[in-house]
Every structure is written in structure tokens, then in C-alpha cells.
Amino acid sequence: MNIRQQLTKFLGLFLTLASAFMFWKGLSVVTNSHSPIVVVLSGSMEPAFQRGDILFLWNRERFNKVGDVIVYEVDAKSIPIVHRVVREHRDKNGRQLLLTKGDNNAADDIALYGRKQSYLRRDKDIVGTVKGYLPKLGYVTILVSENQYAKFALMGMLALSSLLGSE
């Protein structure tokens, strides 16, 4: 294989990755969420959502209501949490404050929030409201993130397919 063919393959791979990145960023802008698609990682929302379900988020509402399923992140943790709003009210500045709980959990989420935080702030902590889902399709990402052998096998297969693939 000459240098021109190698450059063509590299450019094709680069364009594919750049297109995926632009699609993700475009989706982030449309949904107003830095993470418009998330995978359920635990069973805390069963039976509504199972581990491995892919959730589609929308963050253009000004307020959430009791019963909405939201995804939030707090300062202390970088993993998005999917739970239902069980209580809401406004602070003295008019900002919406939310209390959440997993459908399959006995207690609310106050213990998951940051230090000295009793409620989530709608304008600060919420990633988005769940608007749709695909069941079980997220298991691939769970497998890759939890199993280093699966991660290396997937990376190896992708590398081999890009090197050996023909036009």
C-alpha cells in the first residue's frame, strides 16, 4: 500500500470521527444538554428503566414538575444519575429546587447531593429531562467500561477493520 492510499484511509477515519463529534455537539446544542444521550448504569429506576437502557434527554424546559424523570450531576460526582422528581419548590430568588428519588430506592437522594445540599438547583445540576429511551442497547457501553478485556478487544477490532478494510 503506497503513502497516498494510507493517507486516504487516515483521512476517511478522521472524517468519520469528526462527523461523529460534530453530530454530538449539534445534538448538544439542539437539546441544550452537554450529554443528550445517557445509559442507565444501575437498577435504581426499575421497573421504569432497566440497566443498559439508552435515554434521550431534552433540557429546554424552564421548570420540571413532580413526576418528571431527570438526569442530574452534582459537584461531588461526575456520573450522571437518573431519578424521578418527588418534590419541587422555589428559593427566595425564584430558582426551582428539586428533590429526587429512584423508583426502586427506599429513600430520597439527599445523601447523593453535594455537601450541605438538600435540593438540586434546576439551573445548575440538571443535565436534562428524559423524553425517550431504547431498551438494553446501552449494554455495549457498560460492557466496555466495566471490562478491560472487552475494551481492548473492541479497540483491536476497530483498529484491524480500519487497517484491513478496503474500498
UniProtKB/Swiss-Prot annotation:
InterPro entries linked: LexA/Signal_pep-like_sf, Pept_S26A_signal_pept_1_Ser-AS, Peptidase_S24_S26A/B/C, Peptidase_S26, Peptidase_S26B
Gene Ontology biological process terms in this record: protein targeting to ER; signal peptide processing
Record topological domains on the Cytoplasmic side: 1-6
Disulfide bonds: none
Region (C-terminal short (CTS) helix): 153-164
Subcellular location: Endoplasmic reticulum membrane
Top-level taxon: Eukaryota
Lumenal topological intervals: 25-167
NCBIfam families: sigpep_I_arch (TIGR02228)
Domain notes per entry: The C-terminal short (CTS) helix is essential for catalytic activity. It may be accommodated as a transmembrane helix in the thinned membrane environment of the complex, similarly to the signal peptide in the complex substrates.
Protein name: Signal peptidase complex catalytic subunit SEC11
